[in-house]
Amino acid sequence: MKRWILYIIISAVAVVLFFESCAVTSYQRSGQLPVDGLFRPVTNIDTTQNIATISFHDFYNDPLLQQLITEALDSNYNIQLAVNRLAQMSQYLQQSKAAFLPTLDIGLSGSVSDVSKYGNSVRPENPYTELQLIATARWEADIWGKLSSAKRSQQAQYFQQEATVRATQTQIVADIASAYYQLITLDRQRSVTEKNIKSYTDYLQTVEDLKKSAQVTEVAVLQAKSQLAYANAYLPQIDASIAIEENYISLLLGKAPEHISRSSDIDLTRFHSEDLTVGVPAQLLSNRPDVQAAEYALRSAHEQFNVARAAMYPQLTLSGSVGPDAKGLANWFNMPGSLLWNAVAGLTQPILNGRTLKTQKEVAKLQEDAALISFKQSLLNAGNEVSNALASIHFTAQQAKYQIEQVEELKKAFEYSKELLVNGYGTYLDVLSAQNSVLSSELSLYSTYNIIIQQKIILYRALGGGWK
């Protein structure tokens, strides 16, 4: 008999050791992540520092823009929704921690019964009454780490949502800055257009004077009036774009559309320099909130696989109930005679369940693989955004240098053509052509400045800046 008991103990230990070898595994970051060479520099850049580590107050040094960003971080509805979901994740995390504790239920029941007067049973003098107040407890032992894995999975989901909040903040900061500088650009383009309208008006007066002296015909006057109307037509287009940008900023601020105050003395030409500090690609892992969120999603999926695998192992549960059970309330307190209790220890091993547990485990593994793919893709996306922004800044800055030269030469050509016309050596067509070229080239130059500014905003966000 003792030998059989020894065999049972040895077998039980062997089973435990077997399942222990299949127990949960901790998350390890893959060594095959595409980190090196994530972005492609197009010029010599400073990798010893990273603009992503700069707070948005230092990166965007315009006080009015800083005020708008601060207001948006407090009132933007997308950020509020992300924070709300974070609070939900916090509740689920608390629930996962409480799973280690036993459950406790208390039930109160009462019954009254009697028998028929005309049946075979002896009818008691009074109806039979019974009262029960039972407390039932149940506890699952976390011998395979299922509950621990579930808690770690929930922790990862909480941190994932926390990173999502930061990612939302960086996007809102970038959106506010982008729209703000778009407004500044539109203001400059409107100013340029108004200045050119003044020039068109002066030219019209010159042509009318020349017509009086028979140096030009009515055709020249009509052409000058046409070009003045052409220049004036730009203003409503610009005003419409300004209104749209102001409405968009108001939306980001959680407000109804309203006028947006902005600086009028910003020198946009200072933005076309290529003085950039981007750090090293590996820093994207610690700076980019969306990359962090993708890795936390992978951590959660890994722990969910542990949960699904542990569900296939034996489950040890302890349960019990205790409470008074008596015919009447007065008998409740006749303890211990009135007490009803039981205690149960159970070890349950799933055998046949319609492949439910195996399917859950296989699907959980596939979901972990999918999360790893998404994590790798998020890294590539981040590197691609940085590479695109660097390329755009570099080549657009070169373009701006030539456009500055173009504007200066066209202004000279316009002045020379006017002098030639007044002195009888040029034609009004030369003047109109030069005048149109000046207007279009100046508008185009400010659009180029805006592209550089927008790409620097994108680069700052792409490197992970904006949430500190």
Locate each region found by the language model:
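Short helix-capping/hinge motifs at transmembrane helix termini and TM-loop junctions
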Residues: A214, L253-K255, P314, G424, ...
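Amphipathic alpha-helical coiled-coil segments
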Residues: A82-S96, T168, A174-E194, D202, ...
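Terminal intrinsically disordered/low-complexity segments used for targeting and assembly
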Residues: K2-I10, A14-D74, D239-S286, L329, ...
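Phosphate-coordinating loops and pocket residues in cytosolic domains that bind phosphorylated ligands
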Residues: Q223, S286, S433
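Periplasmic alpha-helical coiled-coil/stalk elements that build and connect Gram-negative outer-membrane
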Residues: L147, A156, A163-V280, S392, ...
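Small/polar-residue-enriched beta-strand and adjacent coil segments characteristic
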Residues: P63-L64, L68-E71, Q80-V83, S90, ...
